[in-house]
Amino acid sequence: PENYDLIYRGPIDLRHALAQSINVAAIKVLYLAGLQESLRTAKDLGIESLTNTNQYGLTLVLGGGEVSLLDLTSAYSTFANSGTRNPYVGILKIEDENGKVLEEFQPKSSVVLPENIALTISDILADEPARQPAFGVHSALYVDGRDVAVKTGTTNDYKDAWILGYTPSLAVG
């Protein structure tokens, strides 16, 4: 696999590899974590579209499986929420013309990651100095005065790019 900038960096620590979207390191981490266990974790995080788990390989971390932006944003919001997943919902409450509540969403949150793991991932994704070798100083991923965790990605052949970002109170993709 190639990195987006076509540069191979050799050994690199996980913080810098994740912050800079180093593809070779991502494949190694998936290999060490185990594909099936990683797919279970992805499902726990809210990624529902990876249904036929036997069709994926190590290139899954490079876009080898179709995942909707809504699923990705939902999964990253779990990191923002210290490891607790709150399923996304389109309608919170339905009221009649008099304000009487007819139906109301009842959240069913679940802890899917240890808090220290979620906080470490958030810290890495918000580490602007760790991103700098790949994205530059105060790149478009930097938000002055705010700790914003950000992850980028590209589609095959680099035709499209995406960005997910979050704070403890907001996740966008």
Regions found by a protein language model. Give the residues of each.
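Active-site-adjacent helix/loop patches that line small-molecule binding or acyl-intermediate pockets
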Residues: 2-47, 54-79, 124-127
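A penicillin-recognizing enzyme superfamily signal
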Residues: 16, 66-173
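Short coil/turn segments at secondary-structure boundaries
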Residues: 30-33, 40-45, 53-57, 87-92, ...
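Short helix-capping and inter-helix turn/linker motifs at the boundaries of alpha-helical repeat units
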Residues: 50-52, 112
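Short, surface-exposed loop/turn microsegments at beta-strand edges and helix-strand junctions
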Residues: 52-53, 166
